[in-house]
């Protein structure tokens, strides 16, 4: 049975977006289909529609990633926020985040991705999730599971408020310790078991690294054993403490080229839904999947500042969770979204594209790769993703070396 959510439709220049609860999906439809569903007119339809359905021209992001706190006791070596036991200066409280949720709801955002730090430590997390539901947004949660019985029991008590809860498990047993720098797998597993008893909408977030890539089969087998809904794989980013550990933990070119066939094989074997974060799109295009199919599956590259936005614990707006803040707070997104130069290089990917991206058939989908990786490696966020297999092959063929920024040692 197909069921729409309370925020069932949002007008866009190309037509609109239908938000479904069953099956869970955001469905992009053209103006004719929207009219047939009863949506008659919008100021966004005054101009002729873009024949390419350019999603870079959305009226608002689809989702917002809110770092509710930068407090976390774990101390993971690659933490992309650089979280600490004391958190960050100027962190917002519940009232400020409610104001942000109001602004995002007014803009027509569909989903919230709530995280940290470790947001399960916040006594008001459940209130924030409930408020998002009241305002018509679907809150989702990422959690480490590395906290005490009291916090876990509290989270399980309102777990059904979330559309999806993903526990961060970057490997099984020794692979977990290899990525995180300590052995916390048993505690994370304990959280998975408890949360799965509270709700069926539980999955895994897995950051893939050089040392854990070969252990992906164990991650999928674990997810199947625990009857989880999905496995989401994330590329390791040079952000937070990950800046210092990036060279040691990032995957090799061989691993990046093997990612898609490996994941497809494991997904079929274990009959699990798998998601790849947007920074992996260059590794998908390497296998020359038809662009029309990628568009139909909504596989896009760097979505920061367009399909999604982020916010730091202080409320400062970011293009994505891994990017530095811009000169606006998230509760001011209504004005900033339409402003000239908003999100800088995250929106300039088309006009700034250099070869081989400029002539690549996948540019409109890949968008030049991950801006955060590119900025860290080359010093230029608009340059082609230096780890894209197609970029690496082109540079090898043309005798072009990848520009690399000198590391900053602190």
Predicted segments, located by residue:
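N-terminal pre-core extensions flanking Radical SAM catalytic domains
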Residues: 1-86, 105, 405-409
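Iron-sulfur (Fe-S) cluster-binding segments and ferredoxin-like electron-carrier domains
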Residues: 81-90, 324-327, 363-398
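Radical SAM/AdoMet-radical enzyme domain recognition
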Residues: 89, 94-116, 121-252
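Short Fe-S-cluster ligation motifs
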Residues: 103-116, 383-410
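C-terminal accessory region of radical SAM enzymes
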Residues: 253-291, 316-368, 377
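Short, basic/aromatic recognition patches
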Residues: 290-300
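Short, small/polar residue-rich loop motifs at catalytic or cofactor-binding pockets
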Residues: 302-306
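Short, acidic, Ser/Thr-enriched surface-loop or helix-capping motifs
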Residues: 311-312
């Amino acid at each position: 049975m197909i069921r729409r959510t309370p925020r069932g439709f949002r007008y866009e220049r190309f037509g609109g977006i239908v938000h479904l609860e069953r099956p869970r999906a955001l469905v992009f439809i053209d103006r004719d289909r929207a009219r047939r569903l009863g949506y008659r007119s919008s100021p966004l339809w005054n101009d002729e529609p873009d024949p390419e359905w350019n999603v870079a021209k959305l009226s608002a992001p689809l989702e917002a990633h809110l770092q509710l706190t930068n407090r976390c006791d774990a101390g993971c070596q690659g933490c992309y926020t650089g979280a600490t036991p004391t958190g960050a200066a100027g962190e917002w409280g519940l009232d400020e985040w409610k104001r942000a949720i109001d602004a995002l709801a007014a803009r027509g955002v569909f989903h919230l991705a709530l995280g940290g730090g470790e947001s399960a430590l916040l006594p008001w997390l459940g209130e924030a999730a409930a408020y998002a539901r009241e305002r018509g947004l679907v809150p989702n949660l990422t959690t480490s599971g590395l906290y005490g019985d009291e916090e876990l029991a509290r989270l399980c008590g309102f777990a059904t408020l979330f559309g999806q809860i993903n526990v961060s498990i970057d490997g099984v047993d020794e692979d977990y310790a290899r990525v995180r720098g300590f052995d916390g797998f048993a505690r994370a597993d304990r959280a998975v078991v408890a949360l799965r008893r509270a709700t069926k909408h539980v999955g895994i977030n897995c950051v893939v690294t050089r040392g854990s890539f070969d252990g992906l089969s164990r991650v999928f087998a674990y997810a199947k054993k625990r009857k989880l809904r999905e496995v989401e794989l994330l590329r390791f980013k040079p952000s937070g403490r990950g800046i210092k550990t990036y060279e040691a933990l990032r995957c090799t070119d061989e691993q990046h080229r093997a990612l898609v066939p490996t994941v497809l094989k494991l997904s079929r074997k274990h009959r699990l839904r798998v998601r790849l974060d947007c920074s992996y799109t260059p590794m998908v295009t390497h296998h020359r999947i038809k662009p029309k199919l990628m568009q139909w599956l909504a596989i896009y590259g760097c979505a920061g500042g367009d399909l999604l936005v982020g916010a730091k614990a202080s409320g400062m707006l970011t293009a994505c969770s891994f990017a530095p803040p811009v000169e606006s707070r998230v509760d001011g997104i209504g004005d900033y979204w339409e402003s000239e130069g908003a999100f800088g290089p995250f929106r300039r990917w088309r006009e700034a594209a250099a070869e081989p991206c400029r002539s690549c058939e996948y540019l409109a989908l890949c968008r030049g790769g991950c801006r955060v990786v590119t900025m860290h490696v080359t010093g230029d966020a608009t340059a082609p993703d230096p780890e894209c297999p197609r970029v690496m092959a082109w540079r090898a063929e043309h005798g072009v070396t990848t520009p690399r920024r000198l590391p900053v040692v602190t």
